[in-house]
Amino acid sequence: MSGPTKLVFFGNEFPNDDLKALFRGLHRHGKDRRFRQLATFLEESTRVLQNEVAQLPEPLKKLVPHFENLMPLTEVDFRQGPLGAAMESALLTILELGMFIGHYEAEERVWDLSADRTTLAGLSIGLLAAAGVALSTHLAEVVQNGAECVRVSFRLGVYVHDISRKLEAPQADGSLLSWAHVVTGETASDLQEELSRYNTETGTPELLKVFISAADKTSVSVSGPPSRIRAAFRASQRLRYSKSLALPVYDGLCHAAHLYDEETIHRVLHPDGSVIPTSRPVQLALLSSRSGQPFEATTAAELFRAISTELLTGTIFLDNITAGILDRTERCADAPQCQIETYRTSLVFKGLLKALEACFPDRTISTTDLIPWVFQDYGARQPKSYADSKLAIVGMACRMPGGANDLDLFWELLAQGRDTHTTVPADRFDLETHYDPTGETENATRTPFGNFIDQPGLFDAGFFNMSPREAEQTDPMHRLALVTAYEALEMAGIVSGRTPSSNPKRIATFYGQASDDWRELNASQNIGTYAVPGGERAFANGRINYFFKFGGPSFNLDTACSSGLAAVQAACSALWAGEADTVLAGGLNIITDPDNYAGLGNGHFLSRTGQCKVWDQSADGYCRADGVGSVVIKRLEDAEADNDNILAVVLSAATNHSAEAISITHPHAGAQKENYTQVLHQAAVNPLDISYVELHGTGTQAGDAQEAESVLDIFAPRAHRRRADQPLHLGAVKSNIGHGEAAAGIASLLKVLLMYQKNEIPAHIGIPTVINPAIPTDLEQRQVYLPRTKTAWPRAAGQIRRAIVNSFGAHGGNTTLVLEDAPEKQVTVAREERSTHPVVISAKSKKSLAANVETLLAYLDENPETDLGDLSYTTCARRMHHSWRLATAVSDIPALQKFLRNAVSNDAVSQTRPIPTEAPHVVFTFTGQGAYYAGLAQGLFQALPFFRAEVRQLDHLSQRLGFPSIVPVILGEVEEGTATALVTQLSIVIVEIALARLWLLLLGIPAPHAVIGHSLGEYAALAVAGVLSTADALYLVGHRAQLIEEHCTPGSHAMLSVRATIADIERLVGTGADAPTYELSCQNTHQDTVIGGSIQDLNAIREKLEPEGIKCVNVDVPFAFHTAQMDAVRERLAKAVAAVPFKTPSVPVLSPLLGSVVFDGKSINPEYIVRATREPVRFATAIDAAQELGIVNSQTLWVDIGPHPICASFVRSLVPGARIVSSCRRNEDNFATMAKSLCTLHLAGRTPSWAEYFRPDEQAYSLLRLPKYRWNEVNYWIQYLGTWTLDKAHLKNGGSQKRTITDVPSVSSLRTSLIHQVTEETVDKTTATLKAISDIQHPDFLEAVHGHTMNNCGVATSSIWTDMAMTVGEHLYRRLVPGTDHVLMDLCDFEVQHAQVANTNSNTPQPLALEAHLDLPTRHMSLAWYDVNATTNQRADAPFATGSIKYPADPTGAAWSIEWSRITHLIQGRIEALQHLAAENKASTLSKPLAYALFKNVVDYAPRYRGMDRVVIHDHEAFSDITLTTDRHGTWHTPPHWIDSVSHLAGLVMNGSDASNTRDFFYVTPGCGSCRMTEPLIAGGKYRNYVRMFPMPDEAHMYAGDLYILREDKIIGVVEQLKFRRVPRLLMDRFFSPNKNAAAHAAPAPAPAAVPAVKKQPPTETIQPQAPKTEQKQDQLQLPNLASAAPSTANSSSSPSSSGVATPTTEQEAPVADASAVTGVAGKCLELIANETGLGVAELTADATFVQLGVDSLMSLVLSEKLRSEMGLEIKSSLFLECPTVGDLTGWLEQYC
């Protein structure tokens, strides 16, 4: 019985299922080894898309998220962007083929598609998916062919969008418009007739016409640019009233025969010259959607070409597809069954199915949906194996003992066979007191030896954005990790984001560290702010990630002595696992702590006789060593693609553990051998092919013997001996530089990497006597050697050297790496020689910039044969660029050397300034026709594929519009002066649009801030601004040129450039009847004018002007543009432009026609184009208008786009100081112009995309190993002082203990809403003491705090502390004087040093303590409030608020009443005066809502706090009427909301009066002198209060006043000396930001109620060093007094100290003598400081201290905010402490700002 016929139908739309769910299913199944073909297809498709995306221009690349699989692509809606068509086409192709492959694997189907009974069909992009099946004979071939289908789909989408957007730009608002509408009820022939009529009547160019793209019996699809379709449907009555629907086609035009041709198809299929393999035959019939017949293609190449041609040019005829399928089915007359496979259903498919059922009623027709399988679960499967890429080490850096502070010095040390061990230097610890060879002294070391880095404290803090204090507290090994990481990255040429593998989100760090000497010893002597981030291990590489903005994993590993190499192995694993694409790895060790010496010595690890004696008979332990090293590693394929220098290749790496050793610290040969075997198997390397082993080699008897056994058994076995030409060399770097512990492995690796570079093995110096007898004696017989002298290690031709690097940990870990030679670089790209190259140098400080210049000059002097192109590539594309910059464009090395020498000798560095923090705006200016010359932009066209492709694409569009090609003009094939106006003008506009895209898409210049075009150049400007589509711009330029050629006589009129104003011309030429006739054509500047007229008239004018000394130049154009000569074309041009759509500009357009700036979408219209041809070009007026609006200024960067920078001179004249770069220049090589322009942009802060500049022939350039960055170093070092590591051995639980508040039950019955737990209460006859704890997060307390919010955070007001004081005062008084009815109290000298802010985490306790002591004989009680650590219950040493209570001798209060009665009439008189002023509208009357609305300027009160009903205010005087709430809302002495209601009038006066500068300042109260009441406040009581505030004469910015509280016209309370301090409003956020992540132990943040007063100190006061204080909690803001703010004089030295900051005075320029000599940024900063402090600039002498100048902590905050807001400088307020003098500050500013 014959088999069934099969039809597989591939649609052109995604199924209705969730797209992400579909791809998630594919991705999930792709991890299952049951779906091997699917997995391979997904991997290949991902790789194809990665490669295609990598070829896109930089701005388009940025639209695509990083993806290692397809899932991220499904998360992005690409439809609104330029990659919509490309991504949707590619993803649809992947989805259909993936579902097809997965279905076969899920069903375990064998291939059953026979050529004679199988038909494939598809619609649109579905044809490409179908092609993957049509070319295959089994499933594996579908995988291979399918990847190529994905590639073509993507390219097709990119090209369609690119071409279509040149026909019509996208909407400015991002909305999607359809490029196709379906019309039902019309025939294709009728609609074609209607469309032809419409296109003809409107004069629509063929390129832009509306056309039919698809048709069947019942419907027709109409396609075209969206605006043209809409216009057609509006204009055509037939279309307007038809049944139509917009289709979801948003990315451009397909099926357009008038738009694409054979050359287009070729560019889609072979954009980079690649050729699709032609040997693959077509296996299955695939039907054309145009003819319904199988494509007449026999090979893959032919099939892809046929499909691409059909997609781009062929109309879809659905009826033909149906007919073809029916015909193919009918031919198999014996088939009883028809099986159809498709993806869900669609209208087209339903129609096809209906036709089949109708035609073949006797056949069984079945359908299979290829999608449902993806949602099924096929059981757990094992994942696929990990990637097996080789890895490339591309960068390295180090700091090693013996002065080896770079790689060259390290190699020099090794090559010379030096031993670096010495005794412990004094900067580590005092050897005399800490060394005892007898071992009798507890905690002393028994060995005095070690290997040490020279001055490990040297560090460039400013480079890494660290303050001196932070640098000092940061572990030196962490600092050197940063430094070596940078140097390794620099060597590797890593520039973040330059290539896919340098994506910062995919760069990881792995560092090994096994000790914490600095944190445990040096920094712990005075624990500071940066103790945790400066000392905890995780911050070593965490800081690297943070500084470089790396988003990959950050791991700090401790595997004891193998930590460094284990970190490298972990880094390699991350690369193999796909967790990162580039890794930094290394090891860190800096020795300072004698404890570790003692511990290792007592554990018998250390040698007492000196250096590590590896494999020596006298080996007695290891010698400790410093060391810091970093390496950069990538996958090999990435390194090769990135054109990196590969130092060596990592084949495999592994770590295991000596689990079977006899003790945890004893090595185990068996485990070591297992590890070797594992890495050799992974690398597929024969052990006999290893030619070098770098031993762990500690120099211990046990270690050497075990390692010798393991190495010899595996790499030189007796059973399989090495040949004589297979020697195995061994060595150990520890015999030179000691055992670096965590850095030992990285030191070994660096040594081997240097051996690869130098082709040499250093001598092994570890055997000073004789070889250890435990080592086998047959080494030579086994071809094993420990070279005792330098030994050559050459790389033979065609051979690869392989090496092993070992590192073992004392804890039992074994790490091994297998290395091999880097592959020899194959240069496959011929380099386009450029006449001129840019060279750039940069640094983060002036001093480093000067040093970098000097070192580069020295390098060139030593290497005069250096290739300039390679040098340019290295400095531009492969270096990180910093703010201090020098740049030049040169054509040879001698010219560069001259530039560098001049920079050094003329001190050019000191003249430079750092680039601005915010890059300047860019304006594009487009030149006109006068810039034309033959061969324009020829160099760029020939050398830059991107520019060439852009020109050819634009030229193709132009030709499709019916105009001639302009490429011959660019190639110089047209003689000068022979080109027509049409060709000339098209050449200029095409070149200008292509240049603009070159700047924007390739060279990385951002979208311009504005554009301006001069005459003809305005068409290019409008195209770039999106006003005109590219196609319309070319159409108008070409059509206008044709009209001019046809209707204007060339040579009859001309244009004359005159160096004079139009007024001067009129005056000199005259206006009489016999005066020559002329017209204004162009007003280029205020002194440059172009006039036009007949030749005769212009000659006559010239004869009049030149004798007057006025320069005149004929403009080289054949017509007089912008004159009456253009009148002949106006009407015809108006008709041509009428149908052209105009869009709202995407950037401002400086209009030379209107002399203004255009922002809207109506000003530029068809009439504008006609007027611009006839009317003058008012270039100067347009520029003036832009300057007036602030769109351009002296800081603006101008990019002149055109063949010659004609507009540049105009801009320079109009905009003083304008910076202009050119794109091309007549009679100058294009790359000479471009190089200079790129340098100018780079120096201005608009760093070009250097990578793209060199991309076309990057593989032909070499990355040079130039001198490393020269640091501006200072020695930040905290010296270990004393002998406390020895002394602690003798302490037996002694020493003082901090007073703590323990968590015990309350000892008193006192408990209120604010006092929660009394921990101590003692009472005797005359004194009483109470200590209590309260929790701000307690509901009652928290509600009180939130009644007074500032900057959205709850702040404890003074009324809270007042209630607590009165509560405790009354309680203790009654304990001493029982039976007292009413206790009168006077709260005196109340001052809040810093207020409390409620943490946002209410689940975390926020405790505080109150301590009170009452002395009855003196009738006085002292009060103090303290912060409390919630974790330890330990209270702070210093209180945050203090006060006292005085108890009057008269307990009735009569004395107070009498006192106040004497002034009551005065207060009443002032209240009446204010009422009178209010009646005359001279004082303000505020209602309650208005009063509290004013208060919101600073503080927002809860409703219960809003007691003031009415306020009358005049200047700083006011009274208010008050009604208290009727509810106490808690348990209080006096509710805080009542206290606030009767007292916060003073706050309103200061913060709401027009007499206060509330715009720049706000006012907060630090306390009062006295607060007393003769009677308690009553619920619902009505009161009146009065206050007048005065400035305090003895304290700047402080106000004080007395506030009176009256009830029924009687004074019942007074708050005396109520103070308010003025605070700059710019500090609002700094002071009053809520702490959202407060830790459990944290104390509250500050509030506006208590910015502390800064007490003035005598300027001559000697500031003494401060004792260590309790660490300031992260959410407090303590503004210290001057004495505590100023650093001690001992702290201002850069020599080792135990204090705090090492101020960099010795390494920087000496401070200037006086402020008047300071210029630049430093000078401006001093002017700002003088303005803010009220000092004269002359008073800011270099030796003046900021303490003496009155710059207190509050002023420091103000100055830092001012410097940020006004000068853009991010400067911490602590800088005024770290740079205590004006000279220190200016030195710092000159270096880093």
Curated annotation (Swiss-Prot):
Segments of this protein annotated with the region Product template (PT) domain: 1312-1634
Any Gene Ontology biological process: secondary metabolite biosynthetic process
Top-tier EC class: transferase
Region (Disordered): 1642-1714
Record's cofactor remark: Binds 1 phosphopantetheine covalently.
Disulfide pairings: none
Region called N-terminal acylcarrier protein transacylase domain (SAT), residue ranges: 16-250
Keywords on record: Acyltransferase, Phosphopantetheine, Phosphoprotein, Transferase
Location of region: C-terminal hotdog fold: 1482-1629
Polar residues biased stretches: 1660-1681
Pathway: Secondary metabolite biosynthesis
Keyword NADP carried by entry: no
Occurrences of domain PKS/mFAS DH (ranges): 1316-1629
Domain notes: Multidomain protein; including a starter unit:ACP transacylase (SAT) that selects the starter unit; a ketosynthase (KS) that catalyzes repeated decarboxylative condensation to elongate the polyketide backbone; a malonyl-CoA:ACP transacylase (MAT) that selects and transfers the extender unit malonyl-CoA; a product template (PT) domain that controls the immediate cyclization regioselectivity of the reactive polyketide backbone; and an acyl-carrier protein (ACP) that serves as the tether of the growing and completed polyketide via its phosphopantetheinyl arm.
Designated name of the protein: Non-reducing polyketide synthase adaA
